[in-house]
Amino acid sequence: LADAYFDELRSVLGDNARAQHMELTSFSHIDDLIADAGDFDGFISIGPSVLSSDRLLKLHLVLPYGVFIDINPAPSLFDSVQPDLSQTILDALDMLVSSGKRRIGYIGGTGFTMGLYEYPEDGRLTAFRNWTERLGLDAEGLIYAQGAFTVDTGRTLGEEAVNDHRDDMPDAFIVAADSIAVGVLQAFTAAGVLVPRDTSVISINNQAIAQYTSPTLTSYDIDQNELADTAITMLAEAISSRRTLHHHTFISTTLVVRDSFVPAR
């Protein structure tokens, strides 16, 4: 499930590129792209891999026009298109608070915020810490964030949350991704914690699996077609204009309501 999101995004990017008569060649390693850079006008990168600053600098020297989708590892070197996950976290908190929920936890994996430095904290968690403090929400002891973005991680962290709060479960949890949320729901069900009766769950990504969990998963949809189309347009414009300033675009998300959380009307 963790890889499915990026697999789907690659497929959507390929479809959009063909529709715009753009030829794509796939590379799995940055060094291979650096070696063959003379054959290309630009690149689009997909995936969560941490790329070292020295490799990114070398790539920029040989291929200065590039767009990163979903991450922004080198804002001063390349363009980027990302889902607006900080706003998504704020929207989720606002939705939960409007539904009378004040004790809100977070479950997620470990990621990197990159630039000249690497910070070992996923941007969704950074946004959650920021917005809960600004909104005056008590998240003390309600944050579980470690490991990969997998079902196993969700199951492990879900079990930890139940063990810590069996008698005082938070009103709701925001989960960083559907792949983790699947494991969280499994852990809650095994422990007799009923969603949404005992706690609500909101996730992010709206992968196909969200329709088939028990309960079905309320999740923020990331429009992959919009990400891909924007990236292609951005790259084509950068190449044609030979601009040196870099553009960074955020795409909004949309809540798809299912059974794990139904907002108050």
Annotate each PLM feature.
Residues 23, 65, 79, 140-143, ...:
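Conserved beta-strand segments of alpha/beta enzyme cores
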Residues 53-73, 125, 129-132, 187-198:
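A short, gly/pro- and small-residue-rich
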Residues 1-8, 27-32, 81-91, 107-159, ...:
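Hinge/beta->alpha junction and helix N-cap segments in small-molecule ligand-binding domains
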Residues 1-94, 98, 167:
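Alpha-helical recognition/docking segments in bacterial nutrient-uptake
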Residues 11, 15, 94, 98, ...:
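Short, well-ordered alpha-helices that flank and scaffold nucleotide-derived cofactor binding pockets
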Residues 155, 159-265:
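Flexible loop/turn connectors
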Residues 39-47, 105-108, 144, 166-177, ...:
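Periplasmic-binding protein-like
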